[in-house]
């Protein structure tokens, strides 16, 4: 009996699977059963979709773990060379003649500090966030970063997968949600800049009153994200708050001059503002027009603060 079959699936699991399946596209790596199928999906189909969602969730947790590991290492080794940071881009991709894959990477999407080929530690390309196969494109991307004209709007890569994979690539490329995972070495002298910043952290106004990092716990509903973000359900939002007295965490000479002029002409020159000096990346599982994807946001959570 159908009812007996459905009882083999855990109730909370099936509710989660049905909720996720309602967001997924036809034909993708996380596709729904065919719309024309009138009967309710059986346990084997539910198990298959549940496994695919678990795979996406595992990729999310793995990426989050790598990002946190990068951050923890960097925070505890500020005088050493930190581990590579992870950034995820979404290049344009098309399948050319002979089974070649052509990638177009917009320069506007490249992280700060590129194009410096020496900063690129590793680059991995996948046709979708859930694809099991990836291509190491570190060498061709380094070459493009070294040779391409700085004014060129995009970088172009051509991949030559094995002939045995051409048919599968042809089928997957039409519904691809490509992902380029970059592992970047940090820019030089970062730890020394942080050490100098910590030396000027004594607040003349009293503890907790000057420019500093502040954390607020917020739900997806609080942020207005509940209709498009699936995970995490709660975010520890870090932001910069506090006053900017003279010489406190001044970002540059302009901030110092602004402080001096504010003392002389407070009605016409505003005081410096406390703003983020750098950011921590954040990974979201989010709904898209074509299904569910992982997305890294590089400028969402403040990491350090200064006055400007």
UniProtKB/Swiss-Prot annotation:
Q: Which organism is it from?
A: Homo sapiens
Please provide the Gene Ontology terms (biological process) for this protein: cell-cell signaling; cellular response to chemical stress; GDF15-GFRAL signaling pathway; negative regulation of appetite; negative regulation of growth hormone receptor signaling pathway; negative regulation of leukocyte migration; negative regulation of multicellular organism growth; negative regulation of SMAD protein signal transduction
Chain segments annotated as transmembrane: none
Q: Where is this region: Disordered?
A: 152-177
A cellular component term from Gene Ontology for this protein is:
extracellular region
GO MF annotations, alphabetized: cytokine activity; growth factor activity; hormone activity; protein homodimerization activity
UniProt-annotated location(s): Secreted
Give the recorded effect for residue 297 to E.
Abolished formation of a ternary complex with GFRAL and RET
Protein name (database record): Growth/differentiation factor 15
Q: Where is the signal peptide?
A: 1-29
Which residue windows does the record flag with biased composition (Polar residues)?
165-177
Q: Which Pfam families match?
A: TGF_beta
Effect upon mutating residue 283 to A: Reduces cellular signaling mediated by GFRAL and RET
Output the SMART domains linked to this UniProt entry: TGFB
What's the gene? GDF15
Recount the UniProt induction comment for this entry.
Produced in response to various stresses, such as metabolic and toxin-induced stresses or drugs. Expression is activated by ATF4 and DDIT3/CHOP transcription factors downstream of the integrated stress response (ISR). Expressed in response to inflammatory conditions. Expression is induced by metformin, a blood-glucose-lowering drug. Expression is induced by cisplatin anticancer drug. Also induced by physical activity. Expression is up-regulated by obesity. Expression is up-regulated by ketogenic diet.
Give me the disulphide-bonded residues. Answer: 203-210, 211-274, 240-305, 244-307
UniProt keyword Disulfide bond present: yes
Q: In which tissues is it expressed?
A: Detected in plasma (at protein level). Highly expressed in placenta, with lower levels in prostate and colon and some expression in kidney.
Function as written in the Swiss-Prot or TrEMBL entry: Hormone produced in response to various stresses to confer information about those stresses to the brain, and trigger an aversive response, characterized by nausea, vomiting, and/or loss of appetite. The aversive response is both required to reduce continuing exposure to those stresses at the time of exposure and to promote avoidance behavior in the future. Acts by binding to its receptor, GFRAL, activating GFRAL-expressing neurons localized in the area postrema and nucleus tractus solitarius of the brainstem.
The record gives the effect of mutating residue 225 to A as:
No effect on interaction with GFRAL. Attenuates GDF15-mediated food-intake inhibition
Which residues carry attached sugars according to the database record? 70
Describe the protein's quaternary organization and the partners it interacts with. Homodimer; disulfide-linked. Interacts with GFRAL and RET; ligand of GFRAL, which mediates GDF15 internalization and cellular signaling through interaction with RET via the formation of a 2:2:2 ternary complex composed of GDF15, GFRAL and RET.
> What else is noted?
GDF15 was initially considered as a promising factor for the treatment of obesity due to its ability of GDF15 to reduce appetite and promote weight loss. However, while activation of the GDF15-GFRAL signaling pathway is efficient to reduce obesity and promote weight loss in mouse, it only has limited effect in human.
Q: Which residues form the propeptide?
A: 30-194
> Which disease is the protein involved in?
Hyperemesis gravidarum: An autosomal dominant condition characterized by severe nausea and vomiting in pregnancy. It occurs in up to 2% of pregnancies and leads to significant weight loss, dehydration, electrolyte imbalance, and ketonuria. It is associated with both maternal and fetal morbidity.
The UniProt family comment states:
Belongs to the TGF-beta family.
């Amino acid at each position: 009996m159908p009812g007996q079959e459905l009882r083999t699936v855990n109730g909370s699991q099936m509710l989660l699977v049905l909720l996720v399946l309602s967001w997924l596209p036809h034909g993708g790596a996380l596709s729904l059963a065919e719309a024309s199928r009138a009967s309710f999906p059986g346990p084997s189909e539910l198990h298959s979709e549940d496994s695919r969602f678990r795979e996406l969730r595992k990729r999310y947790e793995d990426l989050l773990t790598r990002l946190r590991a990068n951050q923890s290492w960097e925070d505890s080794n500020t005088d050493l060379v930190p581990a590579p940071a992870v950034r995820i881009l979404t290049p344009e991709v098309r399948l050319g003649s002979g089974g070649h894959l052509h990638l177009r990477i917009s320069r506007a999407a490249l992280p700060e500090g590129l194009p410096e080929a020496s900063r690129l530690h590793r680059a991995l390309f996948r046709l979708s966030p859930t694809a099991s196969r990836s291509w190491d494109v570190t060498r061709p991307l380094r070459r493009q970063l070294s040779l391409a004209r700085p004014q060129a709007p995009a970088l172009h890569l051509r991949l030559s997968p094995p002939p045995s994979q051409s048919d599968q690539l042809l089928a997957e490329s039409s519904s691809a949600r490509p992902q380029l995972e970059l592992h970047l070495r940090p820019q030089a002298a970062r730890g020394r800049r942080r050490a100098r910043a910590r030396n000027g952290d004594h607040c003349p106004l009293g503890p907790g009153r000057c420019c500093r990092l502040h954390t607020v716990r917020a739900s997806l509903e609080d942020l207005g994200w509940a209709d498009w973000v699936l995970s995490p359900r709660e975010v520890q939002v870090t932001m910069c708050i506090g006053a900017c007295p003279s010489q406190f965490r001044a970002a540059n000479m302009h901030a110092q001059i602004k402080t001096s002029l504010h003392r002389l002409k407070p009605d016409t020159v505003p005081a410096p503002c406390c703003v983020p000096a750098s950011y921590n990346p954040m990974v979201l599982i989010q709904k898209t027009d074509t299904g569910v994807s992982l997305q890294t946001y590089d400028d969402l959570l403040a990491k350090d603060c200064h006055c400007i």
